């Protein structure tokens, strides 16, 4: 998986005709963060930040996943979303 393919997928996902479902967006977010930052490096958000906690939990589940694997999963998911929602 090349950085260029990953960067293209990151741009493509911004131009989907329809916004993906929340679970799909969490998948995209968590794999993007794992590919670009690595293992989670922040504290879990507070009790009232439900959206922040969901994003944190999704990213935290990928702890230990390699950058390459996260990039590959991200690009594959974006390709699926492009077929499902159009671009």
Curated annotation (Swiss-Prot):
Sequence positions bearing N6-acetyllysine: 8, 19, 55, 77
N-acetylserine modifications at: 2
Location relative to the cell: Endoplasmic reticulum; Golgi apparatus
SUPFAM superfamilies, per database record: Acyl-CoA binding protein
Protein name (database record): Acyl-CoA-binding protein
Modified residues (N6-malonyllysine): 55
Gene3D superfamilies noted in UniProt: 1.20.80.10
PROSITE patterns linked to this entry: ACB_1 (PS00880), ACB_2 (PS51228)
Recorded superkingdom: Eukaryota
Residues modified as N6-succinyllysine: 8, 17, 55, 77
Function (record text): Binds medium- and long-chain acyl-CoA esters with very high affinity and may function as an intracellular carrier of acyl-CoA esters.
Keywords: Acetylation, Endoplasmic reticulum, Golgi apparatus, Hydroxylation, Lipid-binding, Phosphoprotein, Transport
